[in-house]
Amino acid sequence: MKQASPRAGGAKARRGQVARKTKETDVSVELRLEPGESSIATGLPFFDHMLDQIARHGGLTLSVQAKGDLQVDAHHTVEDVGIGLGEALRQATADKAGLARYGVAVVPLDEALVEAVVDLSGRPHLTFNAKLPSGKRFIGAYDVDLTQDFLQAFVNHARICLHVNVRYGRNLHHVVEAIFKATARALRAATAREGTALPSTKGLL
């Protein structure tokens, strides 16, 4: 007998959809809190790969289409995708009744090990403890310093609390990928359903 997913929310799937257009970027994001086929195109292949990690390991169906002023810098594109993804997640988790609320994940990638902890608190906060390997800053056209900027934009607009701790790692690619995977796994746990009650003694999140 097929068992229902712990994230199933009845007939209506939990989803969010955002379109954001500025003089610097044109971003659209659609997110569903259920596994499915994802479509991601930002003009930054490594960043696309990282967003795919969020979808796959977060148990999401994710569509991200972004066009930005990459001839200037990747910052606007990466940050605005973070804004869109955060807003879409906030929509998808607007009804927090029955959600686990908290999620913890520790993810290895060969020699790298990263911990992520999520609280769907309604209060945006990011702690990013990541001493990245020295000697290299770019993976393809992706500036690894933008990882924190992406997560900050995501957290601010999702209105969640996220702690990321890079315990260790030598290979820059492995460390950054483990950051995205750990964040995704923690989100997956936090958005799982555990019943019907709101996970707060205040009665509000």
Curated annotation (Swiss-Prot):
PROSITE patterns: IGP_DEHYDRATASE_2. The keyword Nucleus does not apply. Transmembrane segments: none annotated. Keywords: Amino-acid biosynthesis, Cytoplasm, Histidine biosynthesis, Lyase. It comes from the Bacteria. It catalyses: D-erythro-1-(imidazol-4-yl)glycerol 3-phosphate = 3-(imidazol-4-yl)-2-oxopropyl phosphate + H2O. Residues 1-27 are annotated as: Disordered. Its main location: cytoplasm. GO terms for biological process: L-histidine biosynthetic process. Its EC number is 4.2.1.19. GO terms for molecular function: imidazoleglycerol-phosphate dehydratase activity. It is found in: Cytoplasm. GO terms for cellular component: cytoplasm. Belongs to the imidazoleglycerol-phosphate dehydratase family. This is Imidazoleglycerol-phosphate dehydratase. It comes from Anaeromyxobacter sp. (strain Fw109-5).
